[in-house]
Amino acid sequence: MSDKSELKAELERKKQRLAQIREGKKRKEEERKKKETDQKKEAVAPVQEESDLEKKRREAEALLQSMGLTAESPIVPPPMSPSSKSVSTPSEAGSQDSGDGAVGSRRGPIKLGMAKITQVDFPPREIVTYTKETQTPVMAQPKEDEEEEDDVVTPKPPIEPEEEKTLKKDEESDSKAPPHELTEEEKQQILHSEEFLSFFDHSTRIVERALSEQINIFFDYSGRDLEDKEGEIQAGAKLSLNRQFFDERWSKHRVVSCLDWSSQYPELLVASYNNNEDAPHEPDGVALVWNMKYKKTTPEYVFHCQSAVMSATFAKFHPNLVVGGTYSGQIVLWDNRSNKRTPVQRTPLSAAAHTHPVYCVNVVGTQNAHNLISISTDGKICSWSLDMLSHPQDSMELVHKQSKAVAVTSMSFPVGDVNNFVVGSEEGSVYTACRHGSKAGISEMFEGHQGPITGIHCHSAVGAVDFSHLFVTSSFDWTVKLWTTKNNKPLYSFEDNSDYVYDVMWSPTHPALFACVDGMGRLDLWNLNNDTEVPTASISVEGNPALNRVRWTHSGREIAVGDSEGQIVIYDVGEQIAVPRNDEWARFGRTLAEINANRADAEEEAATRIPA
């Protein structure tokens, strides 16, 4: 209770102080106004008026006379403090009432005496209230008490006019002062700094994406714009041009040697190129990363090295790394996090590694256990750790029956297998091999082609039936052949091409679909469930350049081809071809049975003709 009473008394004192300040302000304002009016009156008619002191004396005498006191009475109550004014007793109130009632009547002098004042404080009833506030952008007006408290605080001395002038002059001089002109040396230092190069590389890539983005504002969702294409839709809209990638400096007059799609970022495509004979001062080897997501015409990343890049792949499980196999035999590793376009790692040119061109690089394994596998044309296969390319983890010579080494030109691993693989060779033979075990090395030889093997690929579509034993090959003998690891003779030979067939690849989603490209600039899609004599869909690239590489996207809805002039073309594959139906695996099984039966009949006929 004592704390509350002290707090209440303190609040009362503050209120009284504020009231005194207000009264003082009002009194000063009234005096100022009165002085102004008096000056005006004196200007019109100067009249000698009584002074303020005389007027106040007369008012005091009139007030004393109204209360029954004479001017000579020495009894004058002392001035009361603000605190005593706020607390009044019943006796004082009664005396005031009696005094008021006697106004106008003449009475004798009143005897004044001393009275004991008893002060009683009654604490106010505590009222608990709850308030809910809502934030708004409008600034609330300050309370009167806060304004008065601010008035009580002594204000800071204002800045002298001279100081203000000097400050303004300084500001004007700063604004008018020209910026510091950088010297050529300082400019070059900034341009070659690590921070500027990183910022410029990142910013230009974003600006290019924004400038190249094109949106069809005339697209009609009602479908009326599809009426003209109804015939194509009925025909399946088999192949349609999507994008073309070409760079005047980095890909002109260069041959596309390899293509690979990123598994982490499906829109990214890496392409490797060999040397440009027309530009001897440019790097011999180039690897460009193209972006399908944005309509920009420049590569996302540019990498190069001093030897022609014969093979390239994204390092699986390492989205920032790109691996390249070079003509000199070196394996190079680029990192897109680095501002350098040159390799961040490379293998040594020594007998422990490759000394011949590396046409095959592949990352196999799982997230926690994976290796980089490389094969060169001297038949040497090496296994590497991506963390250390100074020395291979293990190496092996691919030799068939203690004869000369196999000159490998292409390689493929079956789905989910990291030990067994198939390779194609320069002499036209196909070999199965394994990396580990008692029979490490070449296992079997498959003969059937009459020219060097240019491409090989194992069946990759996963479904109800396992077809991982199948693989296809392409060759200089103008044919594509279908094989199974269970038989060393080809199951079927596709002979619809009239030039070298440079590459072949199974669809990653459709069990009976594969693609091949030839030297006439033609891309063929074969759906073996529909026909085995002619391709289901074909298209020729404008200008008919030789197509060196073909690569499906992971979704199987787009396909990329690279030609001998450095251009990459992306085609959209029609839904009726690319998307398999539920019965495609069963149908493909029946197709294989028919192919095997026809091959057996042909072998029997050939056997009967030989004795005759």
From Swiss-Prot:
Entries under Pfam families matching the protein: Dynein_IC2, WD40
One example GO MF annotation: dynein heavy chain binding
Residues recorded with modification Phosphothreonine: T89
Xref: InterPro entries: DYNC1I1/DYNC1I2, Dynein_IC, WD40/YVTN_repeat-like_dom_sf, WD40_repeat_dom_sf, WD40_rpt
Signal peptide: none
Keyword Transport: yes
Top-level taxon: Eukaryota
PROSITE patterns reported for this sequence: WD_REPEATS_2, WD_REPEATS_REGION
Its job: Acts as one of several non-catalytic accessory components of the cytoplasmic dynein 1 complex that are thought to be involved in linking dynein to cargos and to adapter proteins that regulate dynein function. Cytoplasmic dynein 1 acts as a motor for the intracellular retrograde motility of vesicles and organelles along microtubules. The intermediate chains mediate the binding of dynein to dynactin via its 150 kDa component (p150-glued) DCTN1. Involved in membrane-transport, such as Golgi apparatus, late endosomes and lysosomes.
Start and stop residues of the WD repeats: 251-300, 304-344, 353-394, 403-443, 448-493, 496-536, 542-581
Descriptive protein name: Cytoplasmic dynein 1 intermediate chain 2
Keywords from the named record: Acetylation, Cytoplasm, Cytoskeleton, Dynein, Microtubule, Motor protein, Phosphoprotein, Repeat, Transport, WD repeat
The keyword RNA-binding is assigned to this record: no
Subcellular location: Cytoplasm, Cytoskeleton; Cytoplasm
